[in-house]
């Protein structure tokens, strides 16, 4: 008999789907739910129990992963599932929903299921590393009470870092995403300048490779730019949401660069790039896109 905890995954988008897949590969019993029922059907052949409602998905779960689009969706679903959860279950909120929404979710769970444990656990990484279990889990909350979640995190990640009380890891995730967003804007602008001056993205990477600026992320995004394939690893709309969450926590006037990027990316989203990978901002910057 397996000693692994039973897991429910709520939200089977790019990240939730990867989590469920890796859990199944590691022998976990996994139930899943998604607003769009077709998501996750491919995992049923590998053992996923797909449910029509989130309440059904969590009924037997000892560890619940929530990976929903934003704070509003997270709070809505949490209110629905809490009465249906096992009293001692561990609720792992793994989306980037911001600090006020995290505090609301903690209070809501405490009100509806006071014996449950809330673990705040956003991740560093996007779709491709998630599929390879190479993300980093940024966890916060009562680690002792949340011990049953640790083998779950181990199955979906390269490791877990703990940051004290629940909510602290939301803060760290927004710090990391502010850096990522700023980096992506720099990559896109540098690639545009290179193009104007007659260089390809591959030539730009060759000049960077081996030096201090040659981060693997830069290579991945320059490859996307070179191929003009912007299949979302992280949707521009989601990155824009995270930029705004980061700005909401910053001291006034301390992040003028990110403020400008958020304004630009809103224009890109309005121009039809919201569902593309955030690297599609390169394409939006092209003079031809504004012709």
Role assignments for model-derived ranges:
Residues 97-177:
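Rossmann-fold dinucleotide-binding core
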Residues 132-139, 161, 165-197, 208-220, ...:
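Active-site-proximal catalytic alpha-helix in oxidoreductases
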Residues 1-67, 127, 161-162:
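NAD(P)+-binding Rossmann beta1-loop-alpha1 motif at the extreme N-terminus of oxidoreductases
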Residues 271-291:
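NAD(P)-dependent dehydrogenase/reductase Rossmann-like domain
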Residues 54-116:
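Rossmann-fold NAD(P) dinucleotide-binding segment
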Residues 214-278:
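Interdomain hinge/lid region at the active-site interface
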């Amino acid at each position: 008999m397996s000693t692994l905890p039973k897991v429910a995954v709520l939200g089977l988008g790019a990240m939730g789907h990867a989590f469920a897949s890796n859990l199944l590969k590691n022998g976990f019993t996994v139930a899943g739910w998604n607003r769009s029922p077709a998501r996750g059907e491919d995992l049923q052949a590998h053992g996923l129990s797909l449910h029509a409602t989130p309440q059904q998905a969590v009924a037997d779960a000892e560890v619940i992963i929530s990976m929903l689009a934003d704070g509003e969706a997270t709070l809505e679903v949490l209110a629905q599932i809490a009465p249906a959860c096992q009293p001692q279950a561990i609720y792992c909120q793994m989306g980037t929903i911001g600090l006020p929404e995290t505090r609301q979710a903690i209070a809501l769970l405490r009100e509806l299921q006071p014996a449950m444990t809330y673990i705040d656990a956003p991740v560093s990484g996007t779709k491709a590393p998630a599929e390879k279990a190479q993300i980093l889990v940024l966890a916060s909350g009562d680690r002792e009470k949340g011990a049953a979640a640790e083998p779950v995190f181990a199955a979906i990640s390269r490791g877990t870092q703990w940051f004290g009380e629940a909510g602290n890891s939301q803060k760290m995730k927004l710090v990391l995403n502010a850096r990522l967003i700023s980096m992506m804007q720099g990559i896109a602008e540098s690639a545009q300048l290179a193009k104007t001056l007659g260089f390809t993205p591959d030539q730009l990477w060759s000049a960077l490779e081996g030096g201090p600026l040659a981060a693997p992320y830069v290579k991945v995004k320059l490859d996307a730019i070179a191929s003009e394939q912007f299949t979302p690893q992280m949707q521009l709309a989601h990155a824009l949401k995270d930029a705004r969450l980061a700005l909401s926590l910053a001291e006034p006037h301390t992040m003028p660069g990110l403020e400008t990027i958020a304004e630009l990316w809103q224009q890109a989203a309005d121009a039809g790039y919201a569902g593309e990978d955030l690297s599609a901002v390169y394409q939006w910057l092209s003079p031809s896109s504004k012709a």
